[in-house]
Amino acid sequence: MPTLLLRLAGAMQSWGTTSRFDQRDTGKEPSKSGVIGLLAAALGIDRENWTDLEPLTRLSMGVRHDRAGIPKYDYQTVGQGTEEIVNSDGNVQIRSRMILANGKYPSGDHLGEGVQSYRHYLADASFLVALEGEDRSLMERTHAALRDPVWPLALGRKSYVPSESIWIENGLQDAPLRDVLARWPWIGSQRKWEEPPEKLLVSFESEDGSGVLKMDQPLSSFAERRFGSRFVRSEWIPLPHEVPHVPA
């Protein structure tokens, strides 16, 4: 079966599956829901369109950690604060600095309140993602769309842009997913002060129910946001011999 490769490299990327309210998490590797969403953006599949999205969700996914990245987080505030306003009658009024969507100022118990948010991400990470499926026509269209996407592509969040092309020139391979990940050249940028790793961590979808349970298998359109489970097993493989990497 054909295998499609994606290069996910950037200064910041985030692949959350359990984010709630003011806590935005990230996993240690790209989530399947996030990768499928990226493909949907490339193909121009709308958030309400399950018919065209569903074939993508049937692809098997593997991830190779060419550069694991450094877990970090941003502390953000969406705030108000207050200011003193002198009314026409000369009285001093305490007023919020923030204006609500309805054009009014917060008052009462909500005066001066602010929202704190913790947004976790991976810094300086590079992943080689492989997707395997039987529909070669779908794989070819998706590969072409990654080169000329309908909508902008991002690494988990709209502001997290890739530092290299997600599209890989020879990224559609007629070989099993495992074989492609085992032999494809390392995509971590070489730096003068560091040596390439001797081994790379890879994750595969498990068919026998072993491994780690992840709740990132899309079951509906992204507008409905329903996700199911899948099992993922990880192992270490030797670094492929062809190490030099030139961005596409």
Place the predicted regions along the sequence by residue.
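Glycine/small-residue-rich interface belts in oligomeric ring/scaffold proteins
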Residues: 2, 18-90
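Pocket-edge structural micro-motifs
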Residues: 8-10, 65
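Sparse, context-dependent recognition of short Cys/His-centered cofactor- or disulfide-binding micro-motifs
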Residues: 6, 14, 24, 30, ...
